[in-house]
Amino acid sequence: VNHSLKPAHLDQTDLRVALGGPDCKQPYSASLLNISAMSYGSLSANAVLALNSGAKMGNFAHNTGEGGISKFHHQGGGDLIWQIGTGYFACRNNNGSFSAEKFAEKASQDQVKMIEIKLSQGAKPGHGGILPAAKLTKEIAEIRGVPMGQDVNSPPGHSAFSTPLELMEFVQLLREKSGGKPIGFKLCVGKRREFLAICKAMHETGIKPDFITVDGGEGGTGAAPLEFTNNIGSPLSEGLIFVNNALTGFDLRKDIRIISSGKVMSGFGIVKRLALGADLCNSARAMMMALGCIQALKCNTNRCPVGVATTDRTLMYGLDPSDKKVRVYNLHKNLEKSVCEIIGAMGLKDTDDLRPWHLMRRISATEIKHYGEIYEYLEPGSLLQSDIPKSYARAVASAQSSSFDSVRH
């Protein structure tokens, strides 16, 4: 980014973002940076407690991951974003299907501020997930509503809906059963027409999520095939720009917040995502580092040597929540401070002032362009007109609200 000869001052306490569209009855004021989805079971009890306690100290939110809400989330007392994945853990029937009654019971908790439907994640889009039986304790099994002694699988896709229109109906169902709390979904961008089909469903039904979390292919996990981690899913910048364009093109952007996640590790990383179209960011990797993660690559073995990604009590005791919660709090505070200083140095007075042209990229040894020149940015409603931009025309024509399949088979 380029600095200004007339720098501005930003107050760190002003870095809040309101989430909740026209149909939301309980809007939430979120921090600019929050903890991205990581499940209890994948993470240790002490890790979850430290993360949530740090979130409480710093007044930011903690995404539960798809593993459900544990007593360690409650002990921390921090705001929760309850993530619901394809396994419907903590809100499932015995056959693994979604239970609206169990969902309503959990969603009514005051600590739950928002609900996020997980469609896919950047580390392994289209693959599903697994909690090895070695990491499954009786407590985790009770929280998730699964039997002991076997791997816990999250299917690649959802059973509660199978089309874009049904996804919107599911969003509406969760909104009603939660008492009007913000409802959104998370995805890593894959086939463009599929997200455009969701946009068509929003436009046709008038049902819109309150937020969409865009995860980049850079996102990580300790339990994903390397081929998926390295090769599948749109990178965050391209995915973020596309989602912003699609929502803008269908004139939906004004009612929907975009959350960016995927290797957000620095103040500049946050500024970059905001300039490209995000309203706020989530981070998992940086938060794990604050907990003491040394990237030992043992996440899926239950032998994490620093007690972050294990249910082994002997190893878990090496992580002291009373110490690590302060580190989580300090990380968040210092990253937001860095954001304020960078934006102030640019001469801007608010994060909302960031635009793609503020972000510069070297193209060659002799050429620099800003992101407004490198990428196309659509005008509001441009995908609803007869003269659809050429770069989007084929994908829009192939998208249908009644199916994720292409119109052109």
Regions of interest found by a model, annotated:
Residues 1-153, 166, 326, 330, ...:
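N-terminal capping/small domains of soluble enzymes
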Residues 15, 22, 31, 35, ...:
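General secondary-structure edge motif
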Residues 72, 229, 260, 290, ...:
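Flexible domain-boundary/linker segments
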Residues 76, 102, 135-137, 205, ...:
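Alpha-helix boundary/interfacial micro-motifs
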Residues 125-149, 183, 242-252, 275-281, ...:
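Short flexible/disordered coil segments
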Residues 153-316:
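Glycine-rich phosphate/ribose-binding loops and adjacent secondary-structure elements
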Residues 292-356:
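Active-site or pore-adjacent capping/gating segments
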